[in-house]
Amino acid sequence: MFKHETVLLHETVDMLEVKPDGIYVDATLGGAGHSEYLLNKLNEKGHLFAFDQDQTAIDNAKIKLADYSDKVTFIKANFRDMKEALNERGIEAVDGILYDLGVSSPQLDERERGFSYHQDAALDMRMDQEQELTAKIVVNEWSYQDLIRIFFQYGEEKFSKQIAREIERRREVKPIETTGELVDIIKTAIPAPARRKGGHPGKRTFQAIRIAVNDELGAVEDSLEKALTLLKPGGRISVITFHSLEDRITKQLFQEATKGPDLPPGLPVIPDEYKPDFKLATRKPIVPSEEELEQNNRARSAKLRVIEKIIK
């Protein structure tokens, strides 16, 4: 069964200021914790559209949310296609959207999905099992320069060159097939003193490959830009991020959306059309409480940012 500790559960949904008869979107269904809490706040007129590109997540959520089946529509799609999918169903605007950008724990924990550096499995890492690009293709077929780029940009890995060089050396002998082989390569490439600190030595490289396989950052940027255009006045978007790359994208997009155009100084009154359409609902990101961190260590790096469309 899908086990998943929902991070910042109450904060994320409560910050949406849910209207009982509103239309809402869970862009990242996952273990359905946020969806369940949100559905509990809706009356018979309210509705939730829940997105996930992982069929397993949807199948499990249908069981978990069976009591709410008349109030929820499940959509198997990447959240970058959210606007188009909603438009196809006659939905042009919504009251709130939530994102939990963490990889759901079951995907990390299921050995055969190939996400984990703790378990030996085939190199896969696809969120959508129907897509062609896998971690095995990235590791064996991408150029030395491209590997350096993704390890550095997406993993913020200091030893990107050394790891890419060791991958190149090994794959000339035979294809790299498993997560265990990749971990061995990373351990060989990283100097011993560096291996002993900062958690598992494979953490950053695995993150980088996962982001590349699923085009995670491109999808986040595309989806958030479209999400802003879907909001009704007074509507809100809640976004939980887990690493600096996603948080930077979210922060920059939100800052851009809340800025008005450059106007000459000293205008007595700013015309409505020049006022920004959005405002930040939280000045600083909301982070998990000490109590939550004690119960769920995976929440440690979580940050919640919220934006609201201004009623004019």
Swiss-Prot record:
Q: Supply the alphabetized keyword list.
A: Cytoplasm, Methyltransferase, rRNA processing, S-adenosyl-L-methionine, Transferase
Among the entry's GO cellular component annotations, what is one? Answer: cytoplasm
Higher taxonomy:
Bacteria, Bacillati, Bacillota, Bacilli, Bacillales
Q: Where in the cell is it found?
A: Cytoplasm
Please list every transmembrane segment annotated in the UniProt record, as residue ranges. none
Family membership noted in the UniProt record: Belongs to the methyltransferase superfamily. RsmH family.
A Pfam family found in this protein is Methyltransf_5
Q: Name one GO biological process term.
A: rRNA base methylation
Name of the protein described by the UniProt record: Ribosomal RNA small subunit methyltransferase H
Q: Where does S-adenosyl-L-methionine bind?
A: A32, G33, H34, D52, F79, D100, Q107
Cystine connections: none
